[in-house]
Amino acid sequence: MKNRLLNIPLGVVILVAAVSLVFSPTFANAEIKVTPPSNWHANPDNNSTSLIWFQNSTKSVIGVKKAPDFLSFPLFLAGPFVTQFLADKGVLESADQIYFGNSNSGYRYFLNLSSPSKLLDSFSGLPQIGSFLTTIPEGYDVPYKGMLILTQKQGDLYAIIFLSPKENFDSVMKEIQPTLDSIQFN
């Protein structure tokens, strides 16, 4: 009984930390280098540890973000917990491991999102989800598909997220592949 009581708080702490990885602001010294997708608009708040672009014609968003330094969990712990969290939220389509770009690897999640506003509502207690979703114009609340990649370099965790309306997802995904392949974490 005592061990079960200890495991519950530990599990909650690890889950909160893993989810915070994706949605927290960062104040780190690490740097992300990437070739931005052509014909996409950069977020004016982009910096060396948080980069977001938006494409008006397809209402798509891609972002690369470094986790805060206090979230130094190994990827092999964070990945499965994020998988379970997304499954519990009912948005996980599939999960696998991926190798991409400049010797990068990580966990990849494909997500089915009924609409950006419902996603915002379901993650309302988590900071920084808006940095990706609020760039989608109001009134464009259609079903979206998403891809989330968690990766780790030199002990730092990073999240890469791509969101696009379902009808455009595959074609826009092909368009941004060179951007994914150009990502370097220093």
For each predicted feature, which ranges?
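Intrinsically disordered, low-complexity segments enriched in Ser/Pro/Gly/Ala and basic residues
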Residues: V19, F23, N56-K59
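Conserved polar/disulfide-associated segments of primarily extracytoplasmic proteins
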Residues: N46-K153, L157
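N-terminal Sec-pathway targeting helices
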Residues: M1-V13
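Sec-dependent signal peptide cleavage junction
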Residues: V22-E31
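Bacterial N-terminal signal peptides
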Residues: V12-S20
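Surface-exposed amphipathic alpha-helical segments
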Residues: I32, P37-W40, K153-N186
